[in-house]
Amino acid sequence: MAVVCSKADWFVTSCSTTLVAVNLKQSREPFVFDCSKAEKKPKEADVDNKSAGEGSEEKDSDSILAFAISASGKHVALTDDHKRLVLFCTEPSWKCISTRWVVRRCTSLAFTQAEDELYVADKSGDVYSFSILEPHKAGELKLGHLSMLLDVALSPDDKYIITADRDEKIRVSFRRSPYNIQAFCLGHTEFVSSLLVPAGHPDWLLSGSGDGTVNVWHYETGRRLHSVDMRKFGLDSENTEKRFAVSRIISSPDGQHVAVQCEGFPSVQLFTVDCGTEGLLKPADTLTLPLSPWDVTFDSENQLWVLLESEDMKVLLYRHSEQHWRLCDSESPELKKVTNALQTQWHLFKGSVGLESQFKHLYKVNFDNMASYLQKKQERLDLEHKKRAAAANGSKPNKKSKTESGAVPQSTS
């Protein structure tokens, strides 16, 4: 699948093995990085990773699994299926600073606000920190969950590290001493797929889940402030039993708008943040799209970008005007710049259309054994009834009387 993210002046997207970065304000050439041509893993590192428990049956495809942009836009990091962790600087020009190796395949990356560390969450439930100031230093294990981690976030003051896992849990830990847990945010009934500390609200946490809800938390205390069921917005009116996950939650830089994307539905739901009411998200617009989006992001100008899952390249740009979100003209300079940059790599995006859901295997498996139980119960009752009937029939005299049996035998004495 394709992923997009915008920070500072940069619009960055990844698909398959390739990352493409476009500067929205400066006339700079787009930056393209192909992981299949990147530095290969040393043999000794490969042996160490296999001995650490990574299955050799999983083939390395060089596909990008996650990437992150620092708050200033000066650093970008990506991790791929080959277990690389590649760090870039973007100023004065793009440059690969280092290539390091992670123990297991990663699911999420997050920079500190100070941009001195990068936190990496992996599928085994561990979080490692990697230094930005010492770009070749090995990572340090910071904390672990008992199940796969799906997202990691940091508080704006870098005090807390927030982790979400497959087993419905959100954990808030002290970054400097992660063994000290500040709080748990508990309430989802399926895996937690997305985390966001929204701009302008540093004490809030927004979380999305495979249960189809978005929750708003005061994460330092673990208190839930608000919950939104995305089914209420007509996402699944035809099949109310269908399961779906909240795949992305983003907020505009001015902190006034929140956008929620649910996997597999051709729409994006917009909310406004009601600062007068604690933790309240007020429904605003529902953007009905021609196709399901791969991903969405806000840029530094509070514009909403939507990348559609299509064999024909379709990038949409929306602006908030007169209390509504309106589609921008295709001749918009920023949109043309992004479209032209992605056009050269679109063969990679076309190959990702229709791929299997990344959340499909994360849902809890429910067994409906009531019918089997009732059938077995009825079989036991029938068997017991037959036994009782047989016992009742066997207790009655079944022998013929002497008078009916003929002459009485004579004594021989």
UniProtKB/Swiss-Prot annotation:
Sequence segments annotated as region (Disordered): 386-413
GO MF, any single term: enzyme activator activity
Pathway of action: tRNA modification; N(7)-methylguanine-tRNA biosynthesis
Database matches in SUPFAM superfamilies: WD40 repeat-like (SSF50978)
Subcellular localization: Nucleus
Keywords: Nucleus, Repeat, tRNA processing, WD repeat
Family matches, as Pfam families: WD40
Entry keyword Nucleotidyltransferase: no
GO CC, any one term: tRNA methyltransferase complex
Function: Non-catalytic component of the METTL1-WDR4 methyltransferase complex required for the formation of N(7)-methylguanine in a subset of RNA species, such as tRNAs, mRNAs and microRNAs (miRNAs). In the METTL1-WDR4 methyltransferase complex, wdr4 acts as a scaffold for tRNA-binding. Required for the formation of N(7)-methylguanine at position 46 (m7G46) in a large subset of tRNAs that contain the 5'-RAGGU-3' motif within the variable loop. M7G46 interacts with C13-G22 in the D-loop to stabilize tRNA tertiary structure and protect tRNAs from decay.
Description of how the protein assembles with itself and partners: Non-catalytic component of the METTL1-WDR4 complex, composed of mettl1 and wdr4.
Protein name: tRNA (guanine-N(7)-)-methyltransferase non-catalytic subunit wdr4
